Amino acid sequence: MSFLWDIMPIDKHLSTVPETEGCQQRIETRICALPDDLLLQILPHVPTKEAVATSILSKQWRYVWLMLPKLEFKDEGSESVGWFIKKSLQLHKAPKLDCLIVELGPHCPIDVDVRKWVENAVNRDVKDLDFTLLWSAAPTSFPKSLYTCDTLVCLTLSNQILVDVSSPASLPSLLDLSLHYVVYKDDGSLVRLLSSSPVLKRLSVHSHEDDNLKTFTVKVSSLESLNYDENWLKDEVEDNEVDEVVDNEVEVDDLNGSLVIDSPALKELHLSEVWDYCLIENMSFLDEAFISNVPYPDEKFLRSLSSVKHLFLLFSKSMVACCNAIKFSWLIEFYFFPISLVDWLMPLMFLLQNSPKLKTPTIDNDFECLSLSWNQPSSIPGCLLSHLETFRWRGYGGREDAKKLLMTYILANSKCLKTVEISLLATCNLEETQKELKSMPRISQSSQLLISTKKLWRINERTYL
């Protein structure tokens, strides 16, 4: 019962004496004297297995756990976990079950009836349902009643789960949906699931190669946040080959599938390891975009990001041709991560020219890259003249002449500059590089120059190493 001792108010004189048998009995007596209402607030914060164990403390405690609004079961390798969950749900007497979390590991027997557990939760107006099936059984479908649960607010389905929405569905309260490494019966099941959620705000997807979908379509008018990760290819490619994979020229017809996003209310978009063709439409309210390893973007894809205020962009060779054509009229914060095979200096200057309100650009090229070319722009980007306040460069080495010229240009023309944060490559001559940076003229005399070897930046309250 130590988990309860940790949160109980203990008298000062008790906290300074050894835990003798008498002292422990006094503490247990105080715990048992707590009112039921307080116990029902405490027990949801401990594992259900521990909460059930409290029933042996006293007659008062025997039935307390039966009224808990939240049950959480995580398989720790026990073959009896299925029996324990089944009996717990049978004995649980609360009229409503707000939250049910179940995680079954690879050693769990495959004959447990998870469908009945889901049915039990749905029948008791569950609000938060989270199932992770890591067992060796084939993907398991859930009862149809799950997809017509009008109280469900958060739904998380992970791993060996078959999303089968064959009949009309209705999830009028669903706000958060997470689909992680699941399998879909067909494209229609996904479409019906999303279209049945009229107030859905947040969608998180981790897809894999064998999910049985040709096209992943996200058409949700209410959606505000989308996190889509397709990392199956990365697992098959060595780290030193990723850059080459990103920049291989591939025809759209050769791709395995496609990602289609049509969500006009979207404010946050995170795309990572998206190896399929990506089509984005109707995103005029997009505020933040995190684009990492999207190898085949076209101009239409990048143009769909033009309304963002915060942009993280892993910059690939296929993006070079689009830089001069797209205006980022509202961009304030820009994290620019060019891969090693790209001559990126001039594309970056185009992006600066097309981002008149940019305040905080960050360059991250923490690697040795190919030879870069530099041509001084014919006109100074507007953001340098009137908006740019903080300039960051992670992985500055100072050895390449082109990089020195870019750094000199930024410092010499950024009139509103307040802070320059430089993280140096460990391979460079630290003393010489610091001296060189300090000697570069700055038009903003009040600006601070901060130089370190630490590799930590914060973007829109997120930390990136």
Curated annotation (Swiss-Prot):
Pfam families: F-box (PF00646), FBD (PF08387), LRR_At5g56370 (PF24758)
Source organism, top-level taxon: Eukaryota
Domain spans labelled F-box: 28-74
CDD domains assigned: F-box_AtFBL13-like (cd22160)
Domain FBD: 373-424
InterPro entries: F-box-like_dom_sf, F-box_AtFBL13-like, F-box_dom, FBD, FBL13/AtMIF1-like, LRR_FXL15/At3g58940/PEG3-like
PROSITE patterns: FBOX
LRR repeats: 154-181, 182-207, 210-230, 248-273, 339-365
Protein keywords: Leucine-rich repeat, Repeat
Protein name: Putative F-box/FBD/LRR-repeat protein At1g22000
Lineage, broadest ranks: Eukaryota, Viridiplantae, Streptophyta, Embryophyta, Tracheophyta
